[in-house]
Each structure stands twice: as C-alpha cells, then as structure tokens.
C-alpha cells in the first residue's frame, strides 16, 4: 500500500509556503477593527445590471473608461483585476520564468509580493530600506542581475511614508531594458499629488497598481487596477483569467468611479486625513507610545513600550490592531487604521489606561 500522502503530491514550494496572514485570516473577536486599512463604514450601492445569466466582459468597458479618466491615462493603459493582489501575481506570471528569474522588493513592506512569487516558484530578493525607509539604491543595483520585476510600495505599507520621487527615477533608469518596476499605489488617494501615473509615457517598463479597497471604501468588492503601457497590458491580458470580474463587481465599480462617486471618495479622504491628524496628536501624548511616525495614508505606525502586551491588552478589549513586530526594523511597532472618531477614542482611552 502506498505511503504517499496528498501533501507529498503537492509542489515542494507550496508544501514549504507560509500563506499570507491577512487581517481576516488572523481573526479576532473585536468590535473595533483597525487592522486592515479599510474604510470604517459601509457605502451603499444598488445593482443596475441584472444580466447574471450571461458571462461578464473580460475587461468591462464602462469601468475601464471611468478609471482611465479618473487616473489621467488612456483606456488601453488600464487592466482591471480581482484586487491589486491579482495584479501583483499577473506581473510575475507574465515576466518571470520560475526557477530562473527573480523579483525584488524592499522590506518592511507589503507581504503579498513574496507570497505571490513563492507560489509561482520565482526567487525573492530583498534589499531592506535605509533607516528613513527610503530605497537603498546601491543595494538594489548590486542585486538586479536576473531580477525581472521590482516592487515598490508608495506610500509604503506599513510605514506610511512616500518614496522619494528622485529615487524612483534613479530606479527606473537602473532597470531600463532589464526589469519591470511596479509602483504599488494602493493608498495614493490620500496623497494624489505623488502618483507616478504621469510617468508612463517616459518609462515603458513602469507599472502601477491601484485598488478600490481603501479610499473608495470597497474592500469587500475585490477590485483593482494595473496601469501600464499598452505593451505591458497586452502581455498581462494573456495570463489573466477569462472573466476576472463578476457583473455585480463591475456594476458597483463603475458607479464608484462616476463623477459623483469620485466626489464622494474625495470627501471620505478629507474626513480620514482630519481624523488621522487628530489620532496622531493624541497618540503623541500617551505614555506607552514611544514614537509616532508621519503618515500619508489611512493608517498610522507607532512604536510602543511593551508592544506585545499592549497589542494583546487591546485585542482582549475588542480593539484589533496590526502587529508589525516581525517586520525588519519595526520592532515594537503596531499599525493602527484610521477609523471613526468613536473608534479613535476607544483606542486613545485604552492606550491611556495601559500601565507599562
């Protein structure tokens, strides 16, 4: 009788893979959820498309046109996918040969770049950021041989700061003719002046990731975009699933990207930024908080005394934050999503009560 298990039949890299620990996967029984950088309240939409008996468009035209207009690019420079996470994976599948090519990213940063590469069997190279969380361009240059895709998150998750645009330009020159540079702009709505969308004409190897999960308040929709030149988009179209977006998703996304939807999104951003500044000011006055870092996003990174104890104490009170202790250079750090004023007050009151 065979002793081979089902797990033995799996690919070796999958057997050894640690899955991405999303906020939902980590669980918790809270009523103040400040661990996934979501918008704190639901936005209502009504479905207008009832043709659920038919397969959806592969790339829904109305939605693509709306997003292109919003982002300031041409429709042929836009690809829509199941969240920006699918865009991360599509770029690896289109440009990296498993067992031969590599991706490169700069921790501390978003965890899905490595998970996507490892799932596909592509090598991951890391160049930790400098002390100010900016790019180590010399370190990147030293490791570029064999790298096909470089991921840079700006503003960076979880640190919250923008990458210096001059460093981005240097990176794009270093990689010209060698690799695709991916600017992950999931949080760009909170600092739109910093977008690289206007650089696409200058850099044919630039790709930009976007999402409706943050400022558009549609994390449950799973809808993201890749902005790139048409040559890149055409390659991604070869590896994307035939029907990546369901009809209801495309319907709601098109509404969110209407002129009224854009106005509503910008009002949400204004409100979140005001709440962020309130929370930052309060955190700076709390004894257990050692340092509060500047943020260009809808979350705040802070360093705490006895951060693990603080994290657990708030968890036990139903306040769920994101522990960043295991990330390089983030010892003692917790990430706090900016929520409602009531949620901010719950966090402030709980932290003030900490005896550490």
UniProtKB/Swiss-Prot annotation:
Cofactor: pyridoxal 5'-phosphate
UniProt keyword Transferase present: yes
Modified residues (N6-(pyridoxal phosphate)lysine): 214
Pfam families named in the record: Aminotran_1_2
Catalytic activity: L-histidinol phosphate + 2-oxoglutarate = 3-(imidazol-4-yl)-2-oxopropyl phosphate + L-glutamate
EC number: 2.6.1.9
GO molecular-function terms, A-Z: histidinol-phosphate transaminase activity; pyridoxal phosphate binding
Gene3D superfamilies reported for this sequence: Aspartate Aminotransferase, domain 1, Type I PLP-dependent aspartate aminotransferase-like (Major domain)
CDD domains according to UniProt: AAT_like
A biological process from GO: L-histidine biosynthetic process
Pathway stated in the Swiss-Prot or TrEMBL entry: Amino-acid biosynthesis; L-histidine biosynthesis; L-histidine from 5-phospho-alpha-D-ribose 1-diphosphate: step 7/9
InterPro entries documented for this protein: Aminotrans_II_pyridoxalP_BS, Aminotransferase_I/II_large, HisP_aminotrans, PyrdxlP-dep_Trfase, PyrdxlP-dep_Trfase_major, PyrdxlP-dep_Trfase_small
Root EC class: transferase
UniProt KW keywords: Amino-acid biosynthesis, Aminotransferase, Histidine biosynthesis, Pyridoxal phosphate, Transferase
Assembly, per entry: Homodimer.
Name assigned to this protein: Histidinol-phosphate aminotransferase
Species of the source: Escherichia coli (strain ATCC 8739 / DSM 1576 / NBRC 3972 / NCIMB 8545 / WDCM 00012 / Crooks)
């Amino acid at each position: 009788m065979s002793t081979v298990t089902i797990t033995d039949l799996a690919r070796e890299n999958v057997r050894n893979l640690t899955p991405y620990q999303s906020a939902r996967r980590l669980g918790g029984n809270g009523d103040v959820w400040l661990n996934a950088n979501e918008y704190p309240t639901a936005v209502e939409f009504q479905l207008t498309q009832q043709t659920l008996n038919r397969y959806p468009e592969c790339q829904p035209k109305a939605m693509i046109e709306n997003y292109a207009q919003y982002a300031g690019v041409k429709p042929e420079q836009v690809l829509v996918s199941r969240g920006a996470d699918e865009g991360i994976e599509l770029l690896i599948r289109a440009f990296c040969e498993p067992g031969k090519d590599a991706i490169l990213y700069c921790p501390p940063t978003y965890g899905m770049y490595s998970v996507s590469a490892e799932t596909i069997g592509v090598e991951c190279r890391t160049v930790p950021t400098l002390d100010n969380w900016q790019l180590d361009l010399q370190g990147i240059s030293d490791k570029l041989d064999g790298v096909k895709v470089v991921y840079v998150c700006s503003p960076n998750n979880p640190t919250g700061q923008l990458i210096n645009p001059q460093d981005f330009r240097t990176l794009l020159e270093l990689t010209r003719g060698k690799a695709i540079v991916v600017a992950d702009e999931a949080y760009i709505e909170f600092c739109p002046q910093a977008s690289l969308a206007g650089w696409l004409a200058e850099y044919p190897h630039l790709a930009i990731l976007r999402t409706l999960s943050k400022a558009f308040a549609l994390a449950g929709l799973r809808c993201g975009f890749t902005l790139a030149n048409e040559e890149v988009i055409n390659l991604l179209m070869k590896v994307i699933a035939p029907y990546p977006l369901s009809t209801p998703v495309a319907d709601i996304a098109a509404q969110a990207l209407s002129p009224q939807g854009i106005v509503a999104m910008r009002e949400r951003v204004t409100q979140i930024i005001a709440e962020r500044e309130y929370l930052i000011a309060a955190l700076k006055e709390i004894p257990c908080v050692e340092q509060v870092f500047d943020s260009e996003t809808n979350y705040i990174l802070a360093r705490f005394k006895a951060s693990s104890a603080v994290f657990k104490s708030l968890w036990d009170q139903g306040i769920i934050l994101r522990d960043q202790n295991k990330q390089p250079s983030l010892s003692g750090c917790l990430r706090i999503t900016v929520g409602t004023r009531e949620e901010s007050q719950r966090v402030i009151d709980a932290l003030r009560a900490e005896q550490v």
